[in-house]
Curated annotation (Swiss-Prot):
Keywords: ATP synthesis, CF(0), Chloroplast, Hydrogen ion transport, Ion transport, Membrane, Plastid, Thylakoid, Transmembrane, Transmembrane helix, Transport. It comes from Carica papaya. HAMAP family: ATP_synth_b_bprime. Its main location: plastid. This is ATP synthase subunit b, chloroplastic. In plastids the F-type ATPase is also known as CF(1)CF(0). It is a single-pass membrane protein. It is found in: Plastid, Chloroplast thylakoid membrane.
Length: 184
């Protein structure tokens, strides 16, 4: 770059008597010199500037393509995430409904088993009461029978004397003897 500017400086120091030269003083330049300088800059700088702009354009296009690919990937991931969310929400709803119905079913099972258990306990209680009543009745009967028996024995012992006792035995023996003769 320095060689190019040096050549312009040397061109500016050429003798100006009747020859064509570059005036490096910008304020003293005329439109022809300016147009020549601009023409040279455009001619030589056009390729460099065009390459720079093409490179910049390619980078921008690549960035846009990458951004679009990333956006498409993000949209695809978003759709997948939404689909997973819908699936999870449906499963959660299904679990909630199943859970409520399962809880309701368990509640009714528990109520039914509890009522059956209470019914069985009531039956056991009634059976126990009947058993105890029957046992009490049997004990009372046994005591009444024992008391009646003791009373009868006491009455018989007090009423029967030995003589009456012997007569009763003889009468019974006679009846047995008569019955034996009839059966023979």
């Amino acid at each position: 770059m320095k060689n190019v500017t040096d050549s312009f400086v040397f061109l500016g120091h050429w003798p100006s008597a009747g020859s064509f030269g570059f005036n490096t003083d910008i304020l003293a330049t005329n439109p022809i010199n300016l147009s020549v300088v601009l023409g040279v800059l455009i001619f030589f700088g056009k390729g460099v500037l065009s390459d720079l702009l093409d490179n910049r354009k390619q980078r921008i296009l690549n960035t846009i393509r990458n951004s679009e690919e990333l956006r498409d990937g993000a949209i695809e991931q978003l759709e997948k995430a939404r689909a997973r969310l819908r699936k999870v929400e449906m499963e959660a709803e299904q679990f909630r409904v199943n859970g409520y119905s399962e809880i309701e079913r368990e509640k009714w099972n528990l109520i039914n088993s509890t009522s059956k258990t209470l019914e069985q306990l009531e039956n056991y209680k009634n059976e126990t009461i009947q058993f105890e009543q029957q046992r009490a009745i049997n004990q009372v009967r046994q005591r009444v029978f024992q008391q009646a028996l003791q009373g009868a024995i006491g009455t018989l012992n007090s009423c029967l004397s030995n003589e009456l006792h012997l007569r009763t035995i003889n009468a019974n023996i006679g009846m047995f003897g008569a019955m034996k003769e009839i059966t023979d």
